[in-house]
C-alpha cells in the first residue's frame, strides 16, 4: 500500500465496495482504464476504483445506477488505462487506484475545490476488516460469503421507488 491510494495485489483479485451506495460512474476512462465510481447515499462521499481487469473488469451486469452494499464484490484487479483505446493494459504494475472524495457542496464535485482523502490508514483498516468472498463455480465471478442487509440500502431503495 502507498499513501497515494494504490494497492498492489494480484490480477483478478476481487474488489470490494467500501460503503453502500449507488454506481455513479462505470466504464472506460483514458487515464483510469476500466473504473467504477460509487456515491454514498448521503452524497457526501465518492469512492473511485480504477485500473480494473482487462476484458472482465466488473461484477457481472453491474451498471450505472445500481445499488451496492458495503462488502459486495464490484470488480476485479487489473492494470488498464493510460490509453484512448478501450480495454488496453498500458500500466506495467497491476494495482488498484482507490480514492475517496469528500463533497460538502456541489462546488467540490469537480474543479479546484475537490477534497481527496489520503487513503493509507483507511486501506490498512479495511484490509484487516475485509469482507470474505468465494469464487462462483468455474465462472470468473466472486461473491461475498455472508449476506447482510444494510439499513441505508433499504432506506435508499424505498426513497427511489417513491419517486
Q: What positions do the PLM features span?
A:
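A structural signal for short beta-strand/turn segments enriched in small hydrophobics and glycine
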Residues: 21-23, 65-77
